[in-house]
Amino acid sequence: MRKLLAPLVLLLASTLPAHAQTPAPPVEGDAILKDFAFTTGEKLPELKIRYTTLGTPKRDKKGEITNAVMILHGTGGTGKQFFQPQFANELFGPGQPLDTAKYYIILPDNIGHGGSSKPSDGMRMTFPKYDYDDMVTAQHRMLTEKLGVKKLKLILGTSMGCMHAFIWGTKRPGFAEKLAPFACLPVEIAGQNRMWRTLTIDAIKADPLWQDGNYTTPPAAGLRTAASLSMIAGANPYALQAQYPTREAAEKYKDDAFARMFGRNDANDTIYQLDSSRTYNPWPLLEKIDVPTLWINSADDFINPPAYGITEKAAARMKTTRFILIPASPETKGHSTHTWAKFWKDDLARLLAE
């Protein structure tokens, strides 16, 4: 299945100067992966991976695609999140770092997310217990089996996608010529990071309406806790204090933001999404990353605070990696700085020019 996405065409066109041509419209499709085996030993006869593409593939004399870039979303997101103006308007236009006239951009929805196969499609809690390795395997099969991509110019990943980029670099080295992992650490999910995830899962499961995942009415109390924890985890406290300096302003923002977030996600999907990080740990294999890599975190990231000292130790082991820590300010966005390209687009342009 492939279809054009008219609203996204309008958004992309809005990034262009008046004299520029409108880019080729985004195209949405599904990769149906047969006999998909998960790391747990579970199997599905078919696994669907939804994807969106921008631009046109360019081929060499052998017919191989030479300009493919894959961008990977975070937990609970989809590939279409990268059409937000703070990302798309800084990167995809003429002369910008990921100009769609130059690159063939691939935006997958990962397993358990968006239009891809997920528990809420019907299997609920009997859906295979996927992990990040399964997600990367599905990405690889989508690229090679459906899109005919055997080599990527770049993998750019944010948050969960950042961790996927580290998996690609350590377990499938060389498939991507360059890596850009933003907003994560290349270490096992533990400490506070694992705790807020399991607190969310526990809250959903403790809601009497959840009924072991077989609910007919969404478990609102559990989902409310999930949305609350997510709001805190992704925020920048410096910006919130500067922008909402009174009790009334802070509470109004909280209520408005919560109203936008609450009810968007299925409870079982949320459980799976958060738990899929349980086996992630590229730490023992970091020396395998031997391609130019731009790794960026932000100092105001609640999920990946810089004081851990992990980044210094990791960067010393990755000889081709440049690590940048974006200083905290009232303008940065906490963990979500990863999607605000104005903070790092010049560094990305330098990576691509190497």
Segments predicted by a language model, with ranges:
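Catalytic active-site module of serine/aspartate enzymes centered on a nucleophile-bearing elbow/loop
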Residues: 321-354
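Alpha/beta-hydrolase-fold enzymes
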Residues: 175-260
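Active-site nucleophile elbow and catalytic-triad environment of alpha/beta-hydrolase enzymes
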Residues: 269-285
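Short beta-strand/loop motif that positions the catalytic acidic residue
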Residues: 289, 295-297
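Conserved hydrolase catalytic core segment
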Residues: 150-191
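N-terminal cap/lid subdomain of alpha/beta-hydrolase-fold enzymes
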Residues: 52-120
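Conserved acidic catalytic loop of the alpha/beta-hydrolase fold
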Residues: 133-154
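Conserved alpha/beta-hydrolase "acid-adjacent" motif
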Residues: 302-309
